[in-house]
């Protein structure tokens, strides 16, 4: 899980979702998981 000021899609499988006011990226590739913080 990477914590970044700006989250971006890293590949076509990445999905940007908002969970409890936190923007997250979920993906089949565990390396691509991110959240904004």
UniProtKB/Swiss-Prot annotation:
<dbReference type="GO" id="GO:1990904">
    <property type="term" value="C:ribonucleoprotein complex"/>
</dbReference>
<dbReference type="InterPro" id="IPR000473">
    <property type="entry name" value="Ribosomal_bL36"/>
</dbReference>
<dbReference type="GO" id="GO:0005840">
    <property type="term" value="C:ribosome"/>
</dbReference>
<keyword id="KW-0687">Ribonucleoprotein</keyword>
<dbReference type="GO" id="GO:0003735">
    <property type="term" value="F:structural constituent of ribosome"/>
</dbReference>
<comment type="similarity">
    <text>Belongs to the bacterial ribosomal protein bL36 family.</text>
</comment>
<dbReference type="GO" id="GO:0005737">
    <property type="term" value="C:cytoplasm"/>
</dbReference>
<dbReference type="Pfam" id="PF00444">
    <property type="entry name" value="Ribosomal_L36"/>
</dbReference>
<protein>
    <recommendedName>
        <fullName>Large ribosomal subunit protein bL36</fullName>
    </recommendedName>
</protein>
<keyword id="KW-0689">Ribosomal protein</keyword>
<dbReference type="InterPro" id="IPR035977">
    <property type="entry name" value="Ribosomal_bL36_sp"/>
</dbReference>
<dbReference type="GO" id="GO:0006412">
    <property type="term" value="P:translation"/>
</dbReference>
């Amino acid at each position: 899980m990477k914590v970044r000021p700006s989250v971006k899609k890293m590949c076509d499988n990445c999905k940007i979702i908002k969970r409890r006011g936190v923007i997250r990226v979920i993906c089949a590739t565990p390396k691509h998981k991110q959240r904004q913080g």
